[in-house]
Design a protein with these regions (language model features):
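Outer-membrane beta-barrel biogenesis signature
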Residues: 1-25, 193-213, 226, 337-341
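Extracytoplasmic loops and strand-loop junctions of Gram-negative outer membrane beta-barrel proteins
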Residues: 8-9, 38-40, 126-131, 200, ...
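Outer membrane beta-barrel
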Residues: 11-171, 176-193, 215, 289-313
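Detector for outer-membrane/organellar transmembrane beta-barrel domains
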Residues: 178, 188-192, 196-314
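Outer-membrane beta-barrel "beta-signal"
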Residues: 183-194, 332-336, 341, 360-373
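Gram-negative outer-membrane beta-barrel domains
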Residues: 257-260, 264, 333, 342, ...
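C-terminal hydrophobic structural anchor segments
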Residues: 294-343
Length: 373
């Protein structure tokens, strides 16, 4: 009998004896409540929602070298209709040809490999959400061609090179009358060898690296004739305008015996970031820096601290509404079954220098339960 294999954190797997196909089904949900307060600590906003509810299918068909991955999102956070009216349920739908463990090529829709924080799954975070820097500059997903090369030499020096050519308007856009395309490349260096159990895409040092492990990475993306304000995301540019956008990223990770340190630097450049002033539309030219550190106690309790800062260029500051936005976050996570079942809480303090709106929220307190199969 071809019985399914069930393992928490690894889904339900079906694989016939003939091995001509395999199917792994997974789901996860994040239930979150959040409170926001002004400078006088007066409650201004309450969030209570299923933030993420995802269903994922992975496996191979015909040959183990032909691999597929599908992911669907079902909450309002995931499915908000796109500016062109298209539905936004499909997150990943891609087929890979994997001739060897060293390299693969893919065709379809998936994450664009640019910055580390966005490449990490939202199920593998040590805070309830990614940083404000990632929220502004990440490239999210796109449809197109993807390629990856992984040099593997045991404990010694390793590297990975990743690239893609995608439709520059992001996931589920469908078609573009402009004809623009986004070109993205990323290089990852592992001078002391690779992390245990793909620890470079899991926040914190859950595996407890016995030797110091380091990742140095950089990426660049050129979005030719982008029609959305953030390239793959954001509103449509006014009056059918387009802009050429450049996005750049640098990452550093260090892990050792429960201690983890991350830093991300990223930014966006555009020669003409402004439009008709009456539209209030603009391309966020600027940079951001994120630094976070954590320590894990006995694979159960983790404490983490993060500091994130956004620096808009002077010409877009009147539209961004501030000269600088700094957010400091302290988080606590209780791991029950790794990242598959965990409880998280964090508190953030926001400070915006020369803010146009003096009544912005200063404090945020959030609690979240995550369960995944």
């Amino acid at each position: 009998r071809n019985m399914p294999n069930l393992e928490v954190g690894k889904g339900i797997t079906f694989r016939p004896k003939s091995n001509w196909f395999s199917l792994t089904m997974r789901f996860r949900m994040q239930n979150m409540v959040g409170l926001s307060f002004d400078k006088d600590f007066t409650l201004t906003k309450t969030d209570a929602q299923v933030k993420r509810l995802r269903l994922r299918f992975d496996g191979h068909i015909y040959s183990p070298k032909l691999v597929y991955s599908i992911q669907l999102g079902f909450t309002s956070y995931d499915t908000e209709p796109l500016p062109n009216g298209n539905m936004n349920i499909v997150r990943d739908a891609i087929v890979y040809y994997v001739p060897s463990p060293k390299w693969n090529i893919g065709f379809g829709q998936t994450k664009i490999k640019a910055n580390r924080a966005r490449t990490n799954s939202s199920s593998a975070l040590q805070f309830i959400d990614r940083s404000i820097v990632n929220s502004e500059f990440n490239l999210d997903r796109g449809f197109g061609f993807f390629g990856e090369y992984n040099m593997r030499q045991g404990e010694g020096f390793n590297l990975s090179a990743k690239g893609s050519v995608t439709l520059g308007e992001g996931r589920n856009w469908g078609s573009s009358a402009i004809g623009g395309v986004a070109y993205t490349g990323r290089l990852e260096l592992y001078p002391l060898g690779r992390f245990k159990s793909k620890g470079d895409v899991l926040e914190g040092d859950f595996e407890g690296e016995e030797r110091v492990k380091i990742l140095l990475a950089g990426a660049y993306s050129y979005n030719h004739k982008a029609s959305r304000l953030k390239g793959q995301r954001g509103a449509v540019m006014p009056d059918d305008a387009t802009r050429n956008l450049g996005s750049y990223f640098a990452d550093f990770i260090l892990k050792y015996r429960g201690f983890a340190f991350y830093t991300d630097f990223m930014g966006r450049s555009c020669d003409e970031p402004l439009f008709d002033p009456r539209s209030n539309a603009f391309v966020y030219n600027g940079q951001g820096l994120n630094v976070q550190t954590s320590y894990l106690f006995d694979k159960k309790w983790e404490i983490a601290l993060r500091n994130s800062t956004l620096f808009p260029e002077s010409e877009v500051q009147p539209f961004a509404g501030y000269k600088r936005w700094n957010q400091t976050t302290f988080g606590v996570t209780r791991y029950i079954i790794g990242h598959s079942l965990k409880v998280q809480a964090d508190m953030s303090y926001n400070h915006r220098s020369e803010s146009i709106d003096p009544n912005y929220n200063r404090w945020e307190i959030r609690f979240q339960l995550e369960l995944g199969l």
